[in-house]
Amino acid sequence: PDTGVLKGYCYAAPWKARAAYRYTVETSIYLDANDRSKGFGNRLYTELLQRLQAQNIHSAVGILALPNPHSIRLHEKLGFEYAGCVKEAGFKFDRWIDVVYWQRILSHRIVSP
């Protein structure tokens, strides 16, 4: 049932400002800790990916702060592939955190500039 309580959200933003990267987006998803592993993330992300494909987006890059086993499992389940790690890229919770990149190619079509 719809309780009117926000369970989470996801969005996409341009990956880089330069025109050459206009077909790649950075994706983010946030879920309430009590609502993980209940299918909300899968439904949200699936809808986002469908909308991105409809907008002719070629590649989606999920950027995850570590540790984050729930988000890694979600990205794997949705067909993302591990694409790299940046060590100590951020600082939160009084410590340095590594960031990993997970990427999914949405379309192999060649787009005319």
Predicted regions and their residues:
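Acetyl-CoA-dependent GNAT
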Residues: 1-34, 45, 105-106
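Conserved catalytic-core motifs of GNAT/GCN5-like acyltransferases
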Residues: 11, 61-64, 76, 81-98, ...
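Non-catalytic, surface-exposed connector residues within folded enzymatic/regulatory domains
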Residues: 21-22, 38, 80, 96
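Short hydrophobic/aromatic beta-strand or adjacent loop that forms the aromatic wall/cage
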Residues: 26, 97-101
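Conserved hydrophobic beta-strand within the GNAT/NAT acetyltransferase core sheet
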Residues: 27-29, 60-63
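Conserved acetyl-CoA-binding loop-helix of GNAT-fold acetyltransferases
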Residues: 31, 37-54, 59, 69-77
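Flexible, glycine-/basic-rich loop-and-beta segments that form/coincide
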Residues: 111-113
